């Protein structure tokens, strides 16, 4: 009896060890195969947000950051415990991936140094300061053969993600991006500071070349336009009306999309999406609907839907997506070409604003 008990206990222990081994292997298999070393260039407001997000992503090994302002670098190092490097080159040499969160005017300098050393580059929007810099950066990226992703973060906004599957062929798009005044960002026109977010969304959902642009803008407190409105016409007949202002009494980031049989409202700020659809058949049992009678006597039903919004940190998610693109050798979610196309459209708008201003002066 004693021997039987010992044999049974031994078998049970063996089975438990096997199961533990399987569980351990499963956990190992679930762990990322590659740990990428990453460093951040720029430790200002947005740079600190990136540092905080990267600390939460276990697939990245956050090596450190560089900021040319010594006092800022020291303060951030003491606050976060993340190493402050003494130079850009020292940081780039120590990492696999460079995350560029500097003022736009320094994007090209930082990105070109990283690409020349064949480092993967995540670069905040706008991609660089001018179209000429964008073309030069594209050439460097192609020569380096590495991944580049641009930080057009609204692609990762949960409200847009919830709306995306409902968007077909937009006919009219209206966007308002208004912000309280903040001196940060006034080194560039509001088109490059704020409107670029909506330009990226616009080029994502309208699959047609731009045919005509008319725009106007006003400089009130900074040397460049603080408020701009633009009408963009596409070759497929779609029209967009965009307004961006950094002198508003309240913050607003709303886009409305009108297409055949549907109207989609996206609130990027409050993370809400509303879908209104027109149905030919009337379902009187649907409580979230209203029936309308047209001039010819026919009836249509308008149904209302609010898709579920999955709360995510958009910046953290875009950085995670870049990791995935690198290790799986896939196309980044927001490519260098996407960033260049947005920048070139922004400059066409700036040219239209200047042309409009010249007419007013006459």
What are these regions (language model features)?
Residues 50, 80-138:
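Beta-loop-alpha module in the N-terminal Rossmann-like domain of NAD(P)-dependent dehydrogenases
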Residues 86, 123-124, 148-150, 174-175, ...:
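Hydrophobic residues in well-ordered beta-strands that form the structural core
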Residues 90, 97-100, 317-362:
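C-terminal helix-rich "cap/oligomerization" subdomain common to oxidoreductases
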Residues 128-185:
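A contiguous active-site-proximal alpha/beta segment in oxidoreductase catalytic domains
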């Amino acid at each position: 009896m004693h021997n039987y008990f010992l044999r049974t206990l031994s078998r049970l222990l063996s089975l438990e060890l096997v199961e533990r081994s399987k569980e351990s292997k499963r956990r190992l298999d679930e762990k990322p195969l590659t740990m990428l070393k990453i460093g951040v260039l720029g430790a200002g407001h947005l740079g600190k947000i990136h540092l905080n997000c990267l600390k939460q992503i276990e697939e990245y090994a956050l090596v450190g950051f560089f900021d040319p302002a010594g006092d800022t670098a020291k303060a951030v190092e003491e606050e976060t415990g993340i190493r402050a490097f003494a130079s850009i080159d020292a940081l780039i040499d120590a990492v696999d991936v460079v995350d560029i969160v500097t003022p736009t005017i320094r994007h090209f300098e930082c990105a070109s140094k990283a690409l020349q050393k064949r480092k993967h580059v995540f670069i905040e929007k706008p991609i660089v300061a001018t179209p000429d810099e964008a073309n030069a950066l594209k050439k460097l990226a192609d020569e380096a053969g590495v991944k580049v992703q641009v930080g057009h973060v609204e692609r990762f906004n949960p409200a847009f993600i919830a709306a995306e599957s409902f968007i077909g062929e937009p006919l009219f798009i209206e966007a308002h991006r208004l912000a309280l005044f903040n001196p940060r960002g006034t080194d560039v026109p509001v088109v490059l500071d704020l409107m670029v977010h909506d330009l990226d969304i616009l080029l994502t959902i309208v699959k047609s070349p731009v045919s005509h642009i008319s725009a106007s803008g006003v400089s009130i407190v900074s040397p460049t336009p603080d408020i701009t409105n633009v009408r963009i016409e596409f070759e497929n007949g779609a029209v967009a009306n965009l307004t961006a202002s950094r002198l508003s009494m309240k913050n607003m980031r709303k886009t409305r999309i009108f297409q055949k049989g549907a109207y989609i409202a996206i609130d990027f700020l409050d993370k809400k999406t509303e879908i209104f659809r027109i149905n030919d058949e009337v379902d009187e049992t649907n409580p979230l609907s209203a029936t309308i009678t047209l001039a010819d006597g026919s009836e249509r039903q308008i149904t209302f839907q609010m898709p579920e919004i999955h709360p995510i940190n958009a910046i953290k998610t875009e950085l995670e997506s870049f990791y995935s693109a690198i290790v799986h050798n896939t196309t980044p979610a927001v490519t260098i070409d996407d960033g260049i196309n947005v920048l070139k459209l922004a400059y066409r708008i700036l040219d239209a604003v200047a042309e409009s201003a010249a007419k007013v002066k006459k």
